[in-house]
Amino acid sequence: NRVFAMMFNQRTNCVYRKMHELVTSGDLGAIKRVNWIITDWYRTQSYYDSGDWRATWEGEGGGVLLNQCPHNLDLIQWICGMPSKVQAFCHEGKWHDIEVEDDVTAYLEYPNGATGVFITSTADAPGTNRFEITLEKGKLVCENNVLTLHELEVSEREFCKTAKGGFDKPPCHVKEVETDGLNEQHVGVLRAFAGRILH
């Protein structure tokens, strides 16, 4: 009879909550592809030199994946599900004089055959934070904390099989997705944790 929680506060962000809602509702069909380029974690050598523990296996236990990206890794599996296979190139000290990874490109495969990539680095300037989820009936794009839906009038699979022209494309409507605007972060997670204990 124990209650356990982890502080994955980005799950309270209104944009990511809306992405989770839209994907898990099934209204947009199954996921076909996932792409997250999250390279806006730029760090200088001075940052890494500021403490002997930084960017070491003993002091931090890892690099960009563990230090900068744990919330992104949580979000990609929360929203898209757990991949069944992961292959990755993790480059240790590629751009900085450090012993842990500062550049990662991961390839993901999901149980339904969907594929994806997760790309991160602490050496891209300017960096990018763009999260795309392509589904059977559209695409979600999250960039600069704005969520856009590219919604197809008909499922891509159905259109592919019934379209008469070889270069036809399914009609698509693009709109910014409204959210509730709430972003409770740590307070929201702590409130939920306390509520679970008390009730």
Feature locations, PLM:
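Glycine-rich phosphate/pyrophosphate-binding beta-alpha loops
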Residues: 70, 95, 119-127
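A short, glycine/Asx- and small/polar-enriched loop/turn
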Residues: 99-103
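Short catalytic-loop micro-motif centered on adjacent basic/acidic residues
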Residues: 4-7, 117-119
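Predominantly a Rossmann-like dinucleotide-binding segment in NAD(P)-dependent oxidoreductases
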Residues: 2, 10-97
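C-terminal glycine/acidic-rich active-site capping loop/insertion
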Residues: 110, 132-199
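Beta-strand scaffold of nucleotide-dependent catalytic cores
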Residues: 31-34, 117-120, 142-144
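Short, well-ordered coil/turn segments that N-cap beta-strands
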Residues: 2-3, 112-114
